[in-house]
Design a protein with these regions (language model features):
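Bacterial Sec-dependent N-terminal signal peptides
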Residues: 1-5, 14-41, 252-256
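Residues that line or immediately flank small-molecule/substrate-binding pockets and catalytic motifs
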Residues: 8, 157, 162, 232, ...
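N-terminal targeting leaders for non-cytosolic proteins
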Residues: 24-139
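Solvent-exposed strand-to-loop "edge" motifs in beta-rich extracellular domains
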Residues: 38, 148-152, 159-166, 175, ...
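Short beta-strands within extracellular/lumenal beta-sheet-rich domains
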Residues: 131-154
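Short coil-to-beta strand junction motifs in C2/discoidin
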Residues: 169-182
Length: 256
């Protein structure tokens, strides 16, 4: 399924027409957070995390896509929403490295990524989201479609994974019956809300599981959404609300 999803994302389609001064486009956005190698030494450095230097909730965009990945930061420190991570992942989710302050932004595994790269595509960069329990420390929207007045955006899928910090906390504190769930809510401008979810970790009498492979999160049932918000829900309060995201794919149509 992963290969099918990637091929669908690579098949970028665009249709444009001019009719009495109007302009329309329909295409598939494939957000990988990957940049030219020249960008990394300046903006990321070695094994680091990028937080936008401005105080705007809008956060950052990728390439030409009208999608804003929201963040709330104070003094350069992420308080809620998205950051971009250049941190190398743990090897096959074995938590071999000593615990450190970067674990909140380090993917739990590099499994399936060629050359030890962190993302599912063998690239250097992925996004990390923090669901701060304090609403005042969260952006207004987690992902906002910039052309909502002139078009539509339908999220299709993305890859998700746990961070190293979350994996450690799950293994330290989870007991039978505990579950960690990621929810995505799509909201139209008229207030209509739809929701999809995926389990990031679950402990049962039969099996204990913690996600440590990049896994497809099917978001297609959200339908067109002007805003997408994420919630990381844990039955155990000792597990913080972080998760990794990459390969965000959405179908976009705009008319001007």
């Amino acid at each position: 399924m992963k290969k099918v999803l990637l091929f669908a994302a690579i098949a970028f389609s665009m249709i444009s027409c001019l009719d009495k001064g109007s302009f329309s486009q329909s295409y598939t956005a494939d957000v990988t957070f990957e940049f030219s190698d020249l960008v990394y030494p300046k903006e990321f450095g070695e094994d680091s995390v990028y937080v936008c230097p401005n105080e705007q909730d809008l956060g950052f965009t990728y390439m030409q896509y009208p999608l804003f990945f929201g963040q709330k930061q104070v003094g350069g420190e992420l308080k809620g929403g998205f950051a971009m991570s250049y941190l190398k992942g743990e090897k096959d989710g074995k938590l071999e490295k000593e615990a450190n302050s970067n674990d909140a932004f380090r993917v739990h595994a590099a499994a399936g990524a060629p050359g030890g790269a962190a993302s599912p595509f063998g690239s250097k960069t992925y996004a990390v989201f923090y669901d701060n329990p304090s609403e005042s420390m969260m952006p207004k929207y987690d992902i906002e479609f910039g052309y909502k007045d002139n078009g539509s955006c339908a999220p299709l899928a993305c890859y998700v994974n746990n961070t190293t910090l979350v994996a450690r906390k799950v293994k330290e504190h989870f007991q039978d019956g505990d579950k960690l769930t990621l929810k995505a809510r799509g909201t139209k401008f008229d207030g209509t809300v739809s929701e999809v979810s995926i389990v990031l970790a679950e402990y049962t009498e039969a099996k204990d599981s913690v996600m440590y492979n990049w896994t497809v999160f099917d978001m297609s049932k959200l339908g067109p959404a002007d805003f997408v918000d994420f919630e990381v829900e844990s039955t155990n309060p000792n597990v913080p609300g972080y998760f990794c995201l990459d390969g965000y794919i959405a179908s976009i149509s705009v008319v001007f």
